[in-house]
Amino acid sequence: MLIFAEKYDRNKEEKRKMKRIISILLYMAVLLPLAAQPPKHEVRAAWITAVYGLDWPQTRTTSPEGIRKQQAELIEILDRLKAANFNTVLFQTRTRGDVLYKSAIEPYNSILTGKVGGDPGYDPLAFAIAECHKRGMECHAWMVTIPLGNRKHVAALGKESVTKKKRAICVPYKREYFLNPGHPQTKEYLMSLVREVVERYDVDGIHFDYLRYPENAPRFPDSYDYRKYSKGRSLAQWRRDNLTEIVRYIYKGVKAMKPWVKVSTCPVGKYKDTSRYPSRGWNAFHTVYQDVQGWLGEGIQDQIYPMLYFRGNHFYPFALDWQEQSNGRQIIPGLGIYFLDPSEGNWTLDEIERQMHFIRAHGLAGEAHYRVKYLMDNTQGLYDALEEDFYTAPALQPAMPWIDNVAPTPPSGLTVETPENGYWKPVSYTHLTLP
């Protein structure tokens, strides 16, 4: 009887062990793969920098062959982004008082042709939008806002420079020129550029860069405007209010034209000191007068791309702070992938990987990579890691419920026709020169 009881106990114990093993195997087989799956909705963005041809273009359009080569360079970048399941392109559209689209206000950037104001023979922004959309990617017009360039650059633009056309809203400071955020007409001038882009192009977003005062600018020459318009506010508060008014004015203007066009800014990466970690004197609020969390609270931004080109305690507490103060808007940290280059910082790949894991774990909307060259060069194996580990499946854009909650209308009235002599042909991209 005792032997039977011992066998019975052993059998019960073995069954319990087997159940535990089966449970563990089920967890590994079902839950772990689910945890490893990329999010269904996520912004996966890359900045394509045109200034100085840092990312694009390398070829000048001095001939029809030059046009084809310049377009082919961009297509190669977009093809590789699409292959790695990116879904957002931040395409530099305005640099410093010059542009990469056919504008009635500012001249073409010389990087396209080698000549200031030179017509490249096609419209780069229209081409970029069309090629992004062919690949199912959004194209946002990235516009440098306040800086106008150094004296040499402004002189090269000549009479086409805004410093000549709109002297009242431009100021020199430390051998460079800037739009003056304190002048009431500055917001109207910037809105005129945005209006050109939003009205004429099927752009998915307007993305502002350098929407800020020069760093550490106690002597920025705006004392006349401060005396005239400050109405008793401190200089710092007046400057912050000036930038906020520009943001508010343009946001409302864009939404009045096309509510679905996203409006975003890439501010300085640290808003201000947090309870978790200090900003060490370099932040958006105090250093360059960007009250970005105020913009979020007021609902006059759809997305914020904080330039969190840091690591360790200079990244994680501030990324979390942005998310906690987002007011439900999308926070997409900019990752400093250029630091993977040995000549820039020689970060190891795991620095970027840890940041991406953190972004997902804390529910941020995605990330943006600065800049696309380091993706194309597969610096430290980053492109491979994205393609094989992080972006293994396509992702949809996160919803913007503050715009509307209406789902797209299902397609209707579709028909399928089979011609008598028809045949299947794979899709190929036709690289047309756009007007």
Where are these regions (language model features)?
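Catalytic domains of carbohydrate-active enzymes, especially glycoside hydrolases
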Residues: 72-97
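Active-site neighborhood of glycoside hydrolase catalytic domains
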Residues: 200, 205, 212-267, 271-277, ...
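Substrate-binding cleft of secreted/luminal carbohydrate-active enzymes
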Residues: 302-313, 332-399
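Aromatic- and acidic-residue-enriched segments that line the glycan-binding/catalytic groove
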Residues: 101-113, 147-173, 211-231, 276-282
